Each structure stands twice: as structure tokens, then as C-alpha cells.
Amino acid sequence: MPPMLWLLLNFAAPALGFYFSISCPSGKQCQQALLSGNDILLYCNSSGAHWYYLFTQGKKGRLASLTNISNMEIMPEGSLLIKDPSPSQTGLYHCWNKNGRQVVQYEIDFQDISTLHVTHKDLGQRPLQNETLPLGSKELIFTRWEPWQDCNRCKEPGERKRLGYCYIEEPLKEAMPCWLYLGEMLVWSSRLRPELQVEACHVRCTNNTQLRVDYVIFDNFRLDEETEFVWLDCPLGSMYRPVYWHANDTPLTWESQLSGRDFTTFLDPSTGGRQLQVFQPAIYKCFVQQELVAQFNPATSPETLEAQWRENDAQWREARKALPGRADSVLKGLKLVLLVGTVLVLLGALLKFIRPSPGKRSKQVLMVK
């Protein structure tokens, strides 16, 4: 993607404040599984707040002040923005007010997006089955599903998705997100992974889900000459929001991609379809929460510009050839109009001369030159 396009996208989201956020009641401790690689806002309503963290993977440590971590930013109102979080940043996040009192505490498991298991319900693809953790005990690994997101289209057939997070449960104990449970333990299992499930949907249009933002048009995207593809990034799109793409007004669906029928584009599962890989020029439109937010127009190639120039030049030459004949026709038409006009003037004057107006006795002379 062109650097300017990335720059515009990076400025768009902070200005509009549309980061996906999670919140926790003041004074409470909340536990949440999320996905790595997807921006998140940890809510803390305390202006001038200080944040402390403790990453639970790796060596044991203690709470440290959150400074100089490149992908984290404390917002003016006190919330913590984490851009492109990594699995290694799984851990504890504490928000303290400027008086030194704890406002809220989060336990966050950033589950590895690169291991995401994707299925489509209408294709008969099945989610992961429950398994036992290979530790010799009876810990159960299972998927805890989030509610279905809104349908990505209304009035027309669309799709919706839901996220499933890896959880581990011991007998008679409350389940925990997998990597918060495992902490420093080095355990490998193909079952320790998050999930994404998609299904078809068809709903009526309402105003409840719309973002109510103006859409933006990006011109002149080009396919990379070496790779022959380019990535398009939908502003405000997120794994946690409904996203939908058009290519020349043709819907791009998860069902087509996961069934192997569509090879001209690729919806990136790790971003929930926010990023689209395209292999041919077209007009691409993206929608977030059923609302158009961006349109991407392809750049015109030099070959196309040259062909258009040649076509315009040929049309101009044809017009010049036809110009003399058209001029003669126009001249003849003008002469005919002048002749008819002269005759009408003479007839009008003659009628006035023959029948003068009542009450007027004057001599009228018709002069014809």
C-alpha cells in the first residue's frame, strides 16, 4: 500500500476514536481473552492515570511502570491503547489515578492470532473439539465462544462471525484463558489456539449498528510489480467489528474463500477481514457495521492512458474530416432561416398596409428595397 495511504489510515482512527475497547467496573479486577495483532483500548476513566504491568510469560517479575513500550499509549482520559499486541504481552495491567489509588485491574490473555482456527458453519466445517491438557492431570481445554457479531450486510444476504477463545478448566475450579493459566509453563498442544467461526445471515436494515461517519476515497492503488498483489486496509475495520468488501459491486464472502472458489482476493482472517489482498485492479469498497467507510480506485496504467489518447486522437481527426460537410449544411440552414424570416416580415407589413388599425387615419407606405 502506498505510504501516504498508510499515513491517512493511521491518522483516521485516533481522530475518530473508534478503537474497540473493553471496560471493567471501577475498583474491580477483570479477566479477558483477546487476540494478538488487533488494537485494543483498556478503559480507565481517570485523567492523568498511571499504568503498571506485569507480563506473565517468561521470567518472574514485579509490576513495572508502563513507559517506553512502543506499542502502548496512555490516552488523555486515562485509558490504555495497545496497538498490535503480541502474545508475549499477556499479563496484568493496573490503572492507578494521580492520587496513587488503583482504579481498575485487567488480566489480559493475548492469544496468538497466527494459530487461529477458521471455520464456516454453512460449509459443514467443524470447530475444535475439547481435549485434555497433556500434563497428567484432568485439565480440560475448550473454546469459550463470544456472542455472534452483527450481520455485515442488511437487506441482502450477508455473513456474521464470532470469536472463540482457548480456556482451561480444572475440576471444581473456574476456567481461565489458556495462557493466563499456563503462565511460565512450556506446554505445546495443537488445541491451544483461538477460533473464528462464520455463518450466513439475512437481516433487515436498522440505524442501530451504523457508525455514522463519512467515507473516504483512496485513488491510484497499484499492484506490486514483483509480487503482483497489494494489501488494502479498511479504516475502522477490526476483528471485533463486522467488515464487508465489494469488488466492482460483487460481494466478497468468507464462504467463497473458504470453499476455494475465489482466488482473485484474500480476506485476511487474522484481521477479521479488515485487510484485503487483491491480485487484479478493480474498484474495491469496504463497509464496517453495514456502512460504507472507504473506496479504493486502481491507478490507470500507462498502457491504458496511451490507448485512451489514441482513441481520442482518432475521434478528433474524424471530426475534422467531417467539419467541411457539416459547415455547408449549417450555412444552407442559415440561408433558409433568413429567407423565411424576410417573407414573414413582408407579409406582416403588407397586412398592416391593407387593413389599418381602427381610429387611426394615416398614410402608410410600404417600401421594399
From Swiss-Prot:
GO terms for cellular component: membrane. Glycans are attached at N45, N68, N130. Residues 18-333 are extracellular. The chain crosses the membrane at residues 334-354. Residues 1-17 form the signal peptide. Its main location: membrane. Residues 355-369 are cytoplasmic. It is found in: Membrane. Keywords: Glycoprotein, Membrane, Signal, Transmembrane, Transmembrane helix. InterPro entries: FAM187A/B, Ig-like_dom_sf, Ig-like_fold. The keyword Iron does not apply. It is a single-pass type I membrane protein. Belongs to the FAM187 family. This is Protein FAM187B. The gene is FAM187B.
